[in-house]
């Protein structure tokens, strides 16, 4: 199996970026919802938030297989792709699976 380390590293950096901007994003959301400020100011703050933090959103993060780096057919319970989980289940290496039975 080929491990896609560069893609895994990119996903790790995206998660770190999200964690860094999470506090700023929450502060801006609170400022936008604050009814004491003028509506124009709230909208301006919201536009700043949207324009600067596009790359750090939670939806930009993709779950990847920890062995192969594959994104498609990802099984969340095992953190593996379908192919890797199938091989490990056949060998009996997965928890709570005696044999490949699915």
Swiss-Prot record:
It comes from the Eukaryota. GO terms for cellular component: mitochondrion; ribonucleoprotein complex; ribosome. GO terms for molecular function: structural constituent of ribosome. Keywords: Mitochondrion, Ribonucleoprotein, Ribosomal protein. This is Small ribosomal subunit protein uS14m. Belongs to the universal ribosomal protein uS14 family. The keyword Ribosomal protein applies. It is found in: Mitochondrion. Its main location: mitochondrion. SUPFAM superfamilies: Glucocorticoid receptor-like (DNA-binding domain). Signal peptide: none annotated. One of its GO terms (biological process) is translation. PROSITE patterns: RIBOSOMAL_S14.
